[in-house]
């Protein structure tokens, strides 16, 4: 299956390295966990695309083909990374996207889904943090409904 690689520039000026698989219908945005987008295997992306998804994987800030931030610049947060994901998803289609993240990408995906509920239709977040035994430092609703 053919994929396309390009750059996406967020409204804040961050450039994200992005790869697309499949048609433009039914977007699925994949967030990697602490490494490059290549942690989502090509075979998985291709299989999902053959199933009718527009699979989009990308490098978070400071990884792979995305913007590398100057260490002297102000720090960024999970909320900034979540805003990057939302900007990318909004740039794909008028319809909400399914969002999936692993590791750090899972934490970013959760914040993105909470901060930008109209941008995402679903969230898949296996392995969302460093330890399943870690205590939560935030309180999240057990369910979120669209209005």
Feature map (PLM): residue ranges:
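Conserved HGGG/HGGXW glycine-rich cap/lid loop of the alpha/beta-hydrolase fold
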Residues: 7-68, 74
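A structural alpha-helix within SAM-dependent methyltransferase catalytic domains
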Residues: 45, 86, 114-117
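An N-terminal hydrophobic leader/cap segment in hydrolases
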Residues: 1-7
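Conserved acidic catalytic loop of the alpha/beta-hydrolase fold
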Residues: 79-97
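Helical cap/lid subdomains and adjacent loops of hydrolase enzymes that gate the active-site channel
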Residues: 136-147
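Conserved hydrolase catalytic core segment
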Residues: 95-138
């Amino acid at each position: 299956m053919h994929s396309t690689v390009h750059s996406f520039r967020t409204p804040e000026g961050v450039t994200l390295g992005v790869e697309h698989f499949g048609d433009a219908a039914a977007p699925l945005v994949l967030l990697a966990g602490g490494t490059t987008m290549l942690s989502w295997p090509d075979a998985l992306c291709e299989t999902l695309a053959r199933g009718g998804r527009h699979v989009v994987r990308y490098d978070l800030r400071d990884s792979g083909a995305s913007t590398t931030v100057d260490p002297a610049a102000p720090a960024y947060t999970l909320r900034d990374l979540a805003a990057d994901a939302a900007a990318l998803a909004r740039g794909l289609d008028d319809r909400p996207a399914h969002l999936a993240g692993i590791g750090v990408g899972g934490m970013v995906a959760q914040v993105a889904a909470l901060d930008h509920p109209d941008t995402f239709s679903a969230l898949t977040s296996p392995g969302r943090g460093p330890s399943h035994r870690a205590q939560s430092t935030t309180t999240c609703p057990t369910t979120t409904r669209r209005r």
